[in-house]
Amino acid sequence: YLTAARRIDEDVTGFFFARGDIYEDAAHHNAVFVGRDEDGIPRYAHSKGTAGNFRLDVKGSDKAFNFCYRGEGERLFVFEAPIDLLSFLCLFKKGWQKQSYLSLGGVGEKALLRFLSDRPNIKTVYLCLDSDQAGNDACSRLVKLMPEGYTVHRLLPLYKDWNEVLQHRAEITDGKYLREAIYGLKEPPQEETVEIIRMSEVDTQTVEWLWEPYIPFGKVTI
């Protein structure tokens, strides 16, 4: 399903199959996407039907731990669904394992806020939600909910979502898979700079009249 119908590259699906983050449901042959906590313990599972629009979070799942990949870099790429995440990796493969990628399982903020809390190394967040009004509205809301200190950008896919871009990859001969990149939706507060003056730059002058004559009990008003 993922490779034939969704056109996800085999090296990408194989990577997550080997980790146990994607598997096939034996009973219904659904694709199941697993989300883990920082210790690698499964805390979430989403079942996606290979035919029709069936999708379901497995009972007991914690949406704070959605399907993701944790890299050691400072960048986090955020998507609505696991298939969007996988599609993006196919389109932008170079060095992808260095950075982090997160599916929200929709447009809620729970997984994003938990991920940022667990990963203080993240400095820059790329919101890669669908290129439609719902995706734009969700991005605006997520930016407001995120803590201060992050740089946030918005990447809009050339088509409605990243899998649709992947489906048309052969037609996009110039390799430009973005409709638009909107930079600086949020920026860290700028630290106030204080000018340092070197003593060598200070013009000194001796003022004798201030000290003479000596007045032991009075004050001199200047």
What are these regions (language model features)?
Residues Y1-A31, K186:
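TOPRIM metal-binding catalytic domain and adjacent DNA-binding surface shared by DnaG-type primases
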Residues R7, F15-F16, R55, A64-N66, ...:
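Residue-level preference for alpha-helix termini and adjacent loops
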